[in-house]
């Protein structure tokens, strides 16, 4: 049986992992074994948090809409119900931006729905 020397392949693989973990704290950026574990963990965290980010932003938009709607005399639930009854299709991101940057349009939306 001939001897297999994997010098270049193994070195490239290890250098690739260490390049990814550059900037990690402690031995996670210098030792291959811990760096590999931390890199796999980091990828799992990033996948999980990409999904969580969508939930967090939707919740933030709802909080902002609710705050402005309560300021104008309705709560979030009533406001969204009135919008859907009036068949106005506008997403929550846009509604929250209207509440922050253009409160006159947002208040006109509320006044239209009350009638």
Swiss-Prot record:
Q: For this UniProt record, give its keywords in alphabetical order, as a comma-separated list.
A: Chloroplast, Plastid, Ribonucleoprotein, Ribosomal protein, RNA-binding, rRNA-binding
Q: Mind giving the lineage of the organism this protein is from? A: Eukaryota, Viridiplantae, Chlorophyta, core chlorophytes, Chlorophyceae
What is stated as this protein's family in its record? Belongs to the bacterial ribosomal protein bL20 family.
Localisation: Plastid, Chloroplast
Q: What is this protein called?
A: Large ribosomal subunit protein bL20c
Q: Which GO terms describe its cellular component?
A: chloroplast; ribonucleoprotein complex; ribosome
Q: Taking the first listed entry, what is the main subcellular location of this protein, grouped into a coarse class? A: plastid
**SUPFAM superfamilies according to UniProt:** Ribosomal protein L20 (SSF74731)
Question: Might you name a Gene Ontology BP term for this protein?
Answer: translation
Pfam families with a match to the protein in the record: Ribosomal_L20 (PF00453)
Q: GO molecular function: any one?
A: structural constituent of ribosome
Q: State what this protein does.
A: Binds directly to 23S ribosomal RNA and is necessary for the in vitro assembly process of the 50S ribosomal subunit. It is not involved in the protein synthesizing functions of that subunit.
The record, for PROSITE patterns, names: RIBOSOMAL_L20
């Amino acid at each position: 049986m001939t001897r297999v020397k994997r010098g270049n392949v193994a070195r490239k693989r290890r250098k690739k992992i260490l390049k990814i973990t550059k900037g990690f704290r402690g031995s996670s950026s210098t030792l291959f074994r811990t760096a590999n574990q931390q890199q796999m963990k980091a990828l799992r965290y990033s996948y999980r948090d990409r999904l969580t980010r969508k939930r967090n932003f939707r919740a933030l938009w709802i909080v902002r809409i609710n705050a402005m709607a309560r300021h104008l005399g309705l709560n979030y639930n009533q406001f969204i119900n009135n919008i859907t009854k009036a068949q106005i299709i506008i997403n929550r991101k846009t509604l929250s931006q209207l509440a922050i940057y253009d409160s006159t349009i947002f208040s006109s939306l509320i006044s239209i729905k009350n009638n």
